[in-house]
């Protein structure tokens, strides 16, 4: 009984070994990287400039990219018959939780706030960026240069995985930085036979860094606010240094701002920046040395241009949606004489910038 068992085991082992040798010599198969998987690590540090899009479901196509350089070598299973050639095929696997598919891009979760979609450059004869995940995408180079039978296969330069793009999807609106720890976003496998891939990726791509959504407010009525003072006689300014021009009116404007990413308890202040009059630093220059414009806050105090210590606190509403609030205040403006002299006749105008500070 013992002798028969030994003979049976020997025959079975020989049969399996023979079958494996025949398969390797007769067909194409997967490609294996020399020295293990090549790692590409990209750093992402980007800011969402349009904060109005900090909403659930918003997408930013080609939000960032990577171009890392670096090469690696591979050898592929090929038949011994050198007349047989085949394309080199790629498969990209994304090891993250799937979120959604939008316009042929598949988005995968990075953290609680964001998801990303990626594409990667398949070089060779294709030279195109392909959205991940995918399988059996050829590089359109039908040859045997990667075959393990060729000593030169280890000299072939491979770069796939080194270049690509990232698209961003907002899962939940957020304030400030969303940190991305080192996260694998794809494994790239290679083969010479469709759907027959090895277990070792040729390359893997990792990303890390942060995405920032800044806080801010913008004027609801647009980017500019015009205050027309009207027409005056030159004598309206004479002998009135530092005073409102005769017959002038204080123009009061109510300001409404749309603010993004302002947390509960945060205070918002308005201050003025601009070119001050050379003869009176409390006034905005109007292009005439004898005339300036003064801007007051709602409390009647002058908002001195370029003085950060002089500001007007805004009234801030509760949240109107997930990320937005409104803020409001009033300002008054009027022309003054800065010298008491009779100004030259002509048109005069000035420009001031309203600066918002968040504390």
From Swiss-Prot:
InterPro entries: Adhesion_dom_fimbrial, Adhesion_dom_fimbrial_sf, Adhesion_dom_sf, Bact_Fimbrial_Adh_Pro. Disulfide bonds: none annotated. One of its GO terms (cellular component) is pilus. The keyword Cytoplasm does not apply. It is found in: Fimbrium. GO terms for biological process: cell adhesion involved in single-species biofilm formation. Keywords: Fimbrium, Signal. The keyword Ribonucleoprotein does not apply. Residues 1-24 form the signal peptide. Gene3D superfamilies: Fimbrial-type adhesion domain (2.60.40.1090). Belongs to the fimbrial protein family. PANTHER family: FIMBRIAL SUBUNIT ELFA-RELATED (PTHR33420), TYPE 1 FIMBRIN D-MANNOSE SPECIFIC ADHESIN (PTHR33420:SF31). This is Protein LpfD. It comes from Salmonella typhimurium (strain LT2 / SGSC1412 / ATCC 700720). The lineage of its organism: Bacteria, Pseudomonadati, Pseudomonadota, Gammaproteobacteria, Enterobacterales.
